[in-house]
Amino acid sequence: MVDPDQLPLLAEAHLRAYRLVNSKFPPIALFDDVADACEFETLYQLQALTNPRLQNETGRLELIARAEIPFGIPGCSYATAPFTHVNPAGSRFSDGSYGVLYLASSMDTALAEVRYHQDRYWSNVEGLSYERFVFRGLSCQFNEAGMLDATVIPMTDPIYDPDDYSQANRLGQRVKQARQLGLRYRSVRNAGQDCWALMTPRPVTSIIQTAHYEMIWNGCISSISAIRAV
């Protein structure tokens, strides 16, 4: 089992990375409309009086401390949403009880990661013969200072198992419990590339939309194309 205490800390480095979000999930305007936590609380209370869907839009706010939300940055909503709208099925470094912001070193890597998971999910939907999905491509600027460097772990380690996330989950839980900022690790879906698993959105300084990408599924993801230029 990987001991996070034995992983080296990353030095300060301001980087650009990429991710995809399904276009059916709009940005959460409330996160982007305020400059700090005090403004957020005031506006949230006011909107809650007239908007019965507000809680569904903002997600489970109890899962993230207000101090962790990077209010005032471009794309605060995109940075925060993974921590309030948590996939209960979990992910590589989460058991489903907390959120993780996943980033990739290139858009091709982000596409490869999403392609794999979309293929796996829709292949289990009985009777589905064709579907079209549109994703927003996001460009994220962040500082990896203080994160743990899991790229020193060989790809043969169980945390990199392509399907069994049990060991990666255990590592993620220990990193989360230790209040570490996140991990840099090797992409399992695009050899030679890196990904990041942020346990908090605090390192993010900007996250903006670039292009839209279309995926066509007809038994498998048969095509991916950009449908709007960066």
Regions from the language model: what does each represent?
Residues 105-107:
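Internal, conserved structured core segments that host functional sites
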Residues 1-65, 69-94, 116-230:
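Active-site and NAD+-binding cores of ADP-ribose-processing enzymes
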